[in-house]
Every structure is written in structure tokens, then in C-alpha cells.
Amino acid sequence: MGGEEESDKPKVSPSPLPFRRWKGSWPTAERGRQRRSRGFRAPSRRPSQPRRSDDGGTDVAAPSRRPLPVRRGAGQAARGRAAQSREPREAGATPWMQSPRFSPPPPRAEPPACTLRKHKTNRKPRTPFTTAQLLALERKFRQKQYLSIAERAEFSSSLSLTETQVKIWFQNRRAKAKRLQEAELEKLKMAAKPMLPPAAFGISFPLGGPAVAGASLYGASSPFQRAGLPVAPVGLYTAHVGYSMYHLT
């Protein structure tokens, strides 16, 4: 009997995929409520640690991502290879390539920046002179270009100016008079230079040159033919002309 019952039951083929066997009783609703009331949390699984199955086997853990080790000597080796590849090129350079004619020009040095003169911070503001003060100063300068200390004190008090202002004005006026005098001397030198006659006065024509040319134009049979007049060369009078022009200047 027992054999027949076993033969009547369908045989279940074993699953090719592995499965985990569950140990313990199935979770019920009451047990779930107890866990929630206790604040139970499912343990978090770390990818770096292998997971253990209930049947004692271990699952393959996911490989942890770690940065690849950096080789310190790789950069130095690459730089060394680049330097070695440059050396034969430099050694094989021809002399005309190394000549300064074909080499690039050196970079030009920039000119230094122009530094402006800075005025003093405690510089006093410039006080403009009135028209009456300028006329009095100019009149005094024409009388006397250098004032003594007593004259300067008296003159400055009469114009309601300080002695320093009068002193500086006279210094500037003397410098201006010197510049004007030098300009006048330069003009006199330019005017005193003798004016040389131009080169056209030295050109001499052959005797009877223009007359001969006129005769050839009209021809021998022309009724309007005129006798040729001798023309003296201009070069004979160049000395007299130059002498008269020199004295005229």
C-alpha cells in the first residue's frame, strides 16, 4: 500500500536554480505590529561585506570601487622620453637653421613708463594778480630788473603782496626777457647772412644762338626774315650782378 501511494504522487523535479531555505515560522500580522511598535528597522546591508544565507552559504559580495593607484614614475618617464626625442632633432639641425638670420627676433623690451612729476601736497594755490598789480610790476621791471631787500619790501607793501610773490614774479620776468632776447639775436643772425645768387645767373648761351634759331624757322626765302642780332652771354655779367645783389641785401 505504501508503495502504491508513493507511485501515485507526482514527482517534482528539482529546480535548477538555487533557492534559500526559510527557517522559522512565517511572519504574521501580529508579529509585524509588534516589530513596528518596538521601532524595529531592517539592518542595512553593506556592499563591502559578504552576505550570509540561512543555509550557511555565503553570497558573492559586490566589488567595492576603489581609486586606482597612481604611478608616480609614469609622468617622469613620459617627460624623459620627450626630452630624448627632442635631443636628436636639435643635434641634426643644420648650421643655416641655427644662424641668427633665420632665428626669430628677440622680444622687444617695452620702454619704461613716463613718470609724471608730482607736485607737493602742501603746495600753496596760485594767487592771480590783478591788472593794476601787473601794470605796476611791469613798470617797475622796466625801471630796474633787480630789487634790493628794502626796495622789495616797500614795493610789495604798496601792492598788498608778499615779498616772496614779488621776488618770484621778477625771477620769471627775467627768464622771459632772456628768451625774447635770444630769439631777437637769432633773427638778426638769419637776416645778416648774404643771399647767394641762384645758379641760373651762371648759365651762358652761345653767341647768336636765339637769332640763328629764328632764321632757321622762317627760312631763307621768307619775306619776313630778319637779320640776326648778336647776343652777349649772360655769364659775363654774373660777377657784377652778384656784387650788386650782395650790396642790396
Curated annotation (Swiss-Prot):
CDD domains: homeodomain
Pfam families reported for this sequence: Homeodomain
Keyword Endoplasmic reticulum among UniProt keywords: no
Domain of life assignment: Eukaryota
Chain segments carrying region Disordered: 1-125
GO terms under biological process: BMP signaling pathway; embryonic morphogenesis; ossification; regulation of transcription by RNA polymerase II
Transmembrane regions listed in the UniProt entry: none
GO cellular component terms listed in the entry, alphabetical order: nucleoplasm; nucleus
Subcellular location: Nucleus
Basic residues biased stretches: 116-125
DNA-binding positions: 122-181
Entry GO MF terms: DNA-binding transcription factor activity, RNA polymerase II-specific; RNA polymerase II transcription regulatory region sequence-specific DNA binding
Gene3D superfamilies: Homeodomain-like (1.10.10.60)
Entry keywords, A to Z: Developmental protein, DNA-binding, Homeobox, Nucleus
Chief subcellular location: nucleus
Extent of Low complexity compositional bias: 71-83
Function: Probable morphogenetic role. Acts as a transcriptional repressor.
Family (UniProt): Belongs to the Msh homeobox family.
Protein name: Homeobox protein MSX-1
Species of the source: Gallus gallus (Chicken)
Gene coding for it: MSX1
